[in-house]
Amino acid sequence: MTQMRLTSLLSLTVVLVVLFTNAAAQEANFDGKTIRIVVGFSAGGGFDAYARAIARHYGKYLPGKPAVIVDNMPGAGSLIAANHTYNQAKPDGLTIGHFIGGVVFGQLLGNPAAQFDSQRFEWLGAPAKLDAVCAVTKATGIADL
């Protein structure tokens, strides 16, 4: 493929993506609606603080300026919230699950309490970058992963 054809194809692709993305964004109107953020932890903790900070501003930037509420659903390391988001929330775009990312591995590892298909969740983003650490005592004899 010549350089000119490749450039033309890329340009056409960009134009189509912009057109279709813009059209889809214009279709959504949340006027009179309420968006619910289901938090997998108790009020007052870090996940709750992130959700409330997002809720305070989120509706201002969506068409129709919907109300945004936070619904804390603690328990089982946020598995209760994940199960609820997947099984009981209507798939209408008005519910956002805010639970610990590792909870989706429960289903992949065969946890019978994980009542969802983790591959069917749509990832929106994360309010913060979190670093995890694994530590053991020297007495275990484990030196690395």
Regions found by a protein language model. Give the residues of each.
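Bacterial N-terminal signal peptides that target proteins for export
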Residues: M1-S11
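Bacterial N-terminal signal peptides
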Residues: L10-L19
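N-terminal (or domain-start) structured segment
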Residues: A25-R120, G125, K138-T140
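Hydrophobic/proline-rich hinge and linker segments of small-molecule sensing/allosteric domains
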Residues: G125-L145
